[in-house]
Amino acid sequence: MKHSNKYLKGHTVIRKAVYTLLCVLILSSCEKYVDIKKSSNQALIETANDCQLLLDNYGVMNTGYPSDGEASADDYYLTDDGYLSTSLTQTDRDRYTWAPSGIRPGAAQWVSPYKTVYYANLVLETVEELKSKGSADVTVLNNLRGSALFFRSLCFWQIAQLYAKPYSATSAEQDPGIPLRLSSDINDKSERGTVAQTYTRIVQDLQEAVSLLQPTSTVPTRPNKAAAYAMLARAYLSMEDYAQAQASADASLQLNSQLIDYNTLDVNSYTPFFPRFNKEVLFHSLMEQHPALNPNDIAKINLDLVNTYSANDLRRSIFLKPNSGDNTGSYRFTGNYEPATSALFFNGLAVDEMYLIRAEGYARAGNATAAMGDLNTLLRTRWKTGTYVDMTAVDGTDALNKVVAERRKELLMRGLRWTDLRRLNKDSRFARTLSRSAQGTTYTLPPNDVRYTLLIPQEVINNSQISQNPR
């Protein structure tokens, strides 16, 4: 994405103005920072253009989303050499083996999304001031507010997938949630609240964002209405509210339903989705690089999963490349919607995910025909031309089994598998015990284990005194 020199200079000024406070975000209840007032930042954030510059900070708003969930999931494995690689810390190894005491001493995967929340809150407060003064175009301000609400809800959702229990309608009012930072004032004390409060805020923010955002955006690093509906669909899916997930996915697809014909891609490329921002991308974001997920010489795709791709399924050759030498017989992941060969994985929102969410909603409602219609629409673009035979299903249960299987194959390394495991484990039809081996020892993770909720980083606990997750 190219920007003018004026943009870059303006962006640098704004970034420097807020940087000094970001390191203390959410790490403490801020007693030692009581002399720093939020106005020290807001004095330099005065116009709608300033707000847009903040939201366009790609390094804060679109990157660094948590990757510990994907690293804890079951779509890959490590050889003993990979497990012992010097690029992995002991904490990374603990995450891989689901060690009960595995806790990050540092807080990067907590602070990074809360940094984005901080930016979003600054924008929300500035927009309200501009509205009260009547000093800016209302349409512009509404879009800025919608964008900030989108980013805040996205971050709350991402944090909740790691550090709050999976949503359950029967216990959400009691289960500890995450701190909901709704102000840029760092003096506000962090409190966890409940899972119900967490998801209520996520849904409220997204519903308002949908009403404010424009249908399209100039670049996919900026939110739009289709992306907000898509994020709402993802949130409802994680809440097991399948009717609302289906409706939200449908609303997103009404605005953008473009799919890539994989027959047009170079199956031999290690970056087949070049250039960046392909037409399926509704909103572009990236996970923080995780050493255990490095596809170059560490992470190998689960062979049971590899074998589910048919010979004429182009995803087998586009998403997977055979390794050589000592790693012959294993496969690396090359299906990243971010055209990079590192572990800088795309975890944004895309059209294919919306087809799968809508299909799952149809299947769970017993509408096998509609579910297979969506699944076939997607898969026709994934198979070699002339080889795909439309799937059929005898009933909703049969359709659901097919949709769930294809969801895992299609959304490989998108940062969604951990959330899917947390959700699907509550259904005995899909519950599974995960198993991994390292240095001759086998490690397991049963369905619904408390370890599906990660321990909050020690640095956060030390500084904020919020309650830790149980073990």
Task: Give short role names for the model-derived ranges.
Residues 41-45, 70-85, 165-174, 215-292, ...:
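Short, surface-exposed recognition loops and adjoining beta-strand edges that mediate ligand/DNA contacts
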Residues 2, 30-78, 305, 389, ...:
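Membrane-proximal, proline-rich intrinsically disordered regions
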Residues 90-163, 193, 208-215, 342-351, ...:
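Conserved, well-structured interaction surfaces
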Residues 44, 239-240, 246-351, 398-418, ...:
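Extended ligand-binding clefts on enzyme/binding-domain cores
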Residues 1-28:
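Sec-dependent bacterial lipoprotein signal peptides
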